[in-house]
Amino acid sequence: MNQYYITECIANENASNIPLHIYTVSLLNLNQKYSFVHHIVYELRKRNANVTIAAHGQYIASFQEIVHWGDHKYIKHEYRAIECSNAAERTVLERLLKQELIERCKNEYKIYKDLFCLKTEQSIEMNEIIVHPAIYLSFTVEENGNILIGFEYQHRFEYKKTLEDLLRDRSPLIKEGVEVVDSYNKKSYYYTFVEVAPYTAGEKSPYLQQSVIDYYITKNETWKLKGVHNKTPIVHVRSQNGDIFPYLPHLLRLTCSYEQLMPSTAQQVNRIIKLPPNEKMPKLYQEIFRLLQYQNMLTFRKENVRAANLNYDIFNLSPPLMEFGRNYKTTKVSDGLGQAGVYEPKSITVSYFVDPELNYDPRKKDEILDFTKKLQHLSEKLGVKLNVSKNRVSYLGYCPFDFFKSERLSFELKSIADAFDGTVIVIGTEENIDRAYMAIKREFGAKADIMTQFVIFDSSVVKNLYYQYNVLLGIYAKSGVQPWILSDEMNSDCFIGLDVSHEHGKHASGIIQVIGKDGRMIKQKSIMTAEAGETIANRTMEEIIDESIFSYEKMYGMKPAHITFHRDGVCREDLDHLTRYMQSFQIPFDFIEIIKRPRRRMAVYTNGRWFTVQGLCYAKERMAYLCATDPRESVGMAQAVKIVQKTKCLSIRDVVSDAYKLSFMHIHSMLKTRLPITVHYADLSSTFHNRGLIHPRSVHEQALPFV
């Protein structure tokens, strides 16, 4: 018999029965309320060494009375349980429970932000990277007082070389704003790098009013001065609160995310961190209950990790039928394309832009010519005729051998952009495409509004039929071809994907619209709006709605009966304003949060074996977890998607069903995505817009320039 599990557990205790000391402090500046109260907490922790303290908003809380306040004052002190209907009080209890656990386990665990690393567990060194296995854990207090913990087995990455090593090597990785970590304490401290200080270790620091060497001698931490002399350089780093600290660079390392790893390193790391369910789940449960033994305020039963014991409604969703050419219907993309071709046959114009480094090699040139002929033949079988432009610049010997490596590539591209027609298929070596990608996307895409599809040419894979299908789907996506639609209708008429991309302090909205019950993409548009933080402004939302309804009416001759908004991440938008604006159209709607990485895993256990099931869903009230994929064991364990319904129009089952069906509309690839394409494409759209890779007034509104 199947048993359904999740990496979540409910405490035996209820928040309404846990008394704590709650102090309310006066806020001098509402705009700085978070930094202000955390400054107070920092001082209180130093004065009350054995008391666990947490804060949120204007609340400071502890399970013990805070006796020593120094110069700080509070305006109210209460000893009571929190009001579970009060979101701020729920948050302060969540933080207090987390801090209590950190304080009690810090002798056995190394704490990295939200990660608990066992000191006894061996870190893994791989190339230039150190990998630290860890447990992520979070506390959630619900409005009914239930206390849940969520957990996940994760890894933390940092560079093997210290900041001192990288500075000595003049590494390009060192630049203002990169994250660094001091791992030489019981708790790791994270900062952003600012600069190399204009003074050395033996000179007086304006921030310390003494030299850094004297500072560590005073603190009785002379072990940190090993190898340090008066002329040792000092760096300035900035804390999360904005304070500047002088630091010895050998005490800092650059942090790293998985996405930043070089492909060769990532492949090696995957063999260690991508654990299949049968390895990950038992290890994860063993480690989390070992960690929870240090939590003395709460108790947990091991059987409360079963979805049924957590009051989840458990159900399975079937893959939807998709329609291809000649009304052929199937649940498999490979079957549909192979048997009947694309849903929407048409002719498209393409141009080839070949890396001159390949073109100057006669054997490679012949292989590429053969490859392009096979692409054209296969595409014709699928129902799409590729009309090849005669303006094949690189074939005519126009570009020099090292053209893709040129320091002036952006400038050189300006003079040849007009020579191409239709979608440009850029064929090159992996190294040269990596080098030229951004320049070509900016000059051809953002400035000339030319669609480009990049193809990495590797003799060992280009003959593979699956590879050729993927290349063609990429070309079709750039050319406005609809390869398949959903045969199974959805519960909503119109879907709008929303995202705000944030990079280097810039924020921009993105949008992809999937209009109609068949999942067809009628129009995509990047909204050229710089947003404040991660909130989409009311005026931007109105523009998005106007564009969507107008496009729907143009296609179907009527307004949609229902609209679903898919928001990438947490909703920070003004839903009251959105409701009023939608009422002016008399269209009901649902606003849905799609949380891509909820740090939960779903698994099924039967006959001594753990496994994942595609289409499995755990739902509760207006929230659900969905397992939308079932990857090969070598790839690791499927990641769940969290779906939160902020409105009450459709049922949560209908909402999840629609999101699952839209994960099959990943039309630029043979692989389905675990996300509905509303959110997946909106994410790509806003990121490309933020990086200046999309034309601000593109005429290609049925193409996907960002895939």
Predicted regions and their residues:
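Long, contiguous domain-sized segments
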Residues: M1-K187, E380, V384-N387, N391-F420, ...
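Extended, highly charged clamp/arch subdomains and adjacent linkers
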Residues: L20, V178-F457, V699-V707
